[in-house]
Amino acid sequence: MNTSFNPQRQSYIKYDDSHYLLFLNEQAAEQEDEFSGKISGYTYTGTMPDGSTLIEATGVTAENMRGKFIAGLICIEYTNDDQIALLANGEDTNEHAEELAKFKEVRAAAKKAVDDLLSRAKNQQIKRAIFPQNH
């Protein structure tokens, strides 16, 4: 994982036709600048050098963005085939029950991360609408 400082708050960026960069694990931070002293900003931790996380997501719209981003994060850990197998197996054995519990934890973490990210993005859009000269 990579952690990177950014003086501007980030949320997500369309990378190409089938990928997005999600800026997750946001933490308020300060960094020393040799010219102007301390700079306030944020750190992000992810798989990419800039602290973002690259996910696969196609056909993203405002209406389906949450689901697409959650699915993209889950697919980093589990392929679609793995997910189908986990859900089909259910809890029929102790091993399957443990695997399903772990999957549910990953899914819950992905949902929380995306909800935090989309809340941040919405707040940024509101600020831009209210204070367009500052953004």
What is the predicted role of each segment?
Residues 2-135:
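A preference for well-ordered globular domain cores
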